[in-house]
């Protein structure tokens, strides 16, 4: 199973909360948090002490968009997890396209998936993927950027998205 190795490495959110309780400027995000702890923070809160705490718990710290801080099991990221899932499902990775907008998504592009940085992406992500031929930088944000990339990479053939338009019944 894909999740078991991640679960085995996860120290638990309570250990992380206890270890960083004394650090000012961290606010827990109100998002689902299985095998990760997510916080809002200011850039100054990301210190070597914070990184050392994460390392002592066998975790990585990921800071993105000048606002988001995630504690994840060491070596676990979107790219590695997606690769494991694709292998588990026996899919062809060339049939997969990834999309992102912050540095939290960088690992997917580092695993050499076809991908899109949607419009309004974080500058750091755009810079980190600029030289990757398999990553398209879209103009439109969100779903619009994904549609741009589907067309750019030819996922729907020569006619593209227009072939998918259906007549009203």
Residue ranges with predicted function:
Residues 1-14:
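Glycine/small-residue-rich loop that forms an oxyanion/phosphate-binding "nest" at active or ligand-binding sites
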Residues 3-6, 43, 47, 118-126:
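Short, structured coil/loop segments at alpha-helix boundaries
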Residues 13-111:
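Conserved acidic, metal-coordinating active-site core of Asp-based
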Residues 72, 79-169:
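Mg2+-dependent phosphoryl-transfer enzymes with acidic/Ser/Thr/Gly-rich catalytic loops
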């Amino acid at each position: 199973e894909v999740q078991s190795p991640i679960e085995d490495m996860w120290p638990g959110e309570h250990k992380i909360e206890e270890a960083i309780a004394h650090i000012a400027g961290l606010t827990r995000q109100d998002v689902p948090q299985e095998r990760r702890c997510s916080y809002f923070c200011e850039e100054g809160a990301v210190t070597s002490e914070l990184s050392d705490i994460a390392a002592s718990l066998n975790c990585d710290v990921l800071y993105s968009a000048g606002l988001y801080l995630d504690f994840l099991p060491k070596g676990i990221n979107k790219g590695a997890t997606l690769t494991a899932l694709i292998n588990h499902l026996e899919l062809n990775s060339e049939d997969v396209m990834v999309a992102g907008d912050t540095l939290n998504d960088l690992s997917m592009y580092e695993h050499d998936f076809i991908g899109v940085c949607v419009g309004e992406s974080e500058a750091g992500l755009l810079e980190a993927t600029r030289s990757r031929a398999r990553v398209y930088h879209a103009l439109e944000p969100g779903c619009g950027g994904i549609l741009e990339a589907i067309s750019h990479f030819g996922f729907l053939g020569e006619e593209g998205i227009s072939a998918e338009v259906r007549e009203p019944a």
